[in-house]
């Protein structure tokens, strides 16, 4: 899994001009699923995201997690995180998981996250418009194959 984690003051996702998910303070996740991803990768990602201390405490130190602050998560599927740009000028996306596998994996990932904090989400495979107000900005890239 490749996940871009952004600390946000707010974020929303719309499909065909209709808002389908919105959060206040929390995390915006751009989630890519690879063909070799396993339940172990999913559990690792959830554990890291829920416990990642990237929110400021009363002293201004990044010492609190999304769970600690009572934050929310907006999760967006994004197979383009597996883009291969080595040849030519058009990225290849053959490194991403096939849609049927990736869709189920993405559902399981969001279900697992939602047992810890409220999760809003986009629609897998849809053309989405994502709006966000970055906080910091703080952006972290998590690759479950690089641990």
Swiss-Prot record:
HAMAP family noted in UniProt: Deacylase_Dtd
Reaction equation(s) it catalyzes: glycyl-tRNA(Ala) + H2O = tRNA(Ala) + glycine + H(+); a D-aminoacyl-tRNA + H2O = a tRNA + a D-alpha-amino acid + H(+)
Transmembrane segments: none
Keywords in alphabetical order: Cytoplasm, Hydrolase, RNA-binding, tRNA-binding
Motif Gly-cisPro motif, important for rejection of L-amino acids, residue range(s) on this chain: 136-137
Compartments, as annotated in UniProt: Cytoplasm
Subunit-level organization: Homodimer.
Gene encoding the protein: dtd
Family: Belongs to the DTD family.
Record-listed E.C. numbers: 3.1.1.96
SUPFAM superfamilies the UniProt entry points to: DTD-like
Domain of life: Bacteria
GO BP terms in the entry: D-amino acid catabolic process
Name of this protein: D-aminoacyl-tRNA deacylase
InterPro entries for the chain: Daa-tRNA_deacyls_DTD (IPR003732), DTD-like_sf (IPR023509)
Domain comment quoted from the record: A Gly-cisPro motif from one monomer fits into the active site of the other monomer to allow specific chiral rejection of L-amino acids.
Predominant location category: cytoplasm
Biological role stated in the UniProt entry: An aminoacyl-tRNA editing enzyme that deacylates mischarged D-aminoacyl-tRNAs. Also deacylates mischarged glycyl-tRNA(Ala), protecting cells against glycine mischarging by AlaRS. Acts via tRNA-based rather than protein-based catalysis; rejects L-amino acids rather than detecting D-amino acids in the active site. By recycling D-aminoacyl-tRNA to D-amino acids and free tRNA molecules, this enzyme counteracts the toxicity associated with the formation of D-aminoacyl-tRNA entities in vivo and helps enforce protein L-homochirality.
One GO CC annotation: cytoplasm
PANTHER family recorded: D-AMINOACYL-TRNA DEACYLASE 1, D-TYROSYL-TRNA TYR DEACYLASE
């Amino acid at each position: 899994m490749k996940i871009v984690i952004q600390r946000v003051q707010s974020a929303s996702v719309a499909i065909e001009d209709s808002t389908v998910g919105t959060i206040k303070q929390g995390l915006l996740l751009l989630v890519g699923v690879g063909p070799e991803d396993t339940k172990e990768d999913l559990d690792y990602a959830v554990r890291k995201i829920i416990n990642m201390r990237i929110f400021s405490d009363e002293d201004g130190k990044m010492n609190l997690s999304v769970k600690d602050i009572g934050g929310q998560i907006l999760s967006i599927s994004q197979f383009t995180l597996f883009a291969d740009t080595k040849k030519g000028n058009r990225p290849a996306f053959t490194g991403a998981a096939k849609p049927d596998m990736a869709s189920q994996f993405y559902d399981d990932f969001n279900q697992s996250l939602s047992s810890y904090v409220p999760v809003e989400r986009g629609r897998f495979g849809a053309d989405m418009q994502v709006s966000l107000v970055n906080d910091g900005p703080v952006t972290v890239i998590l690759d479950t194959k690089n641990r």
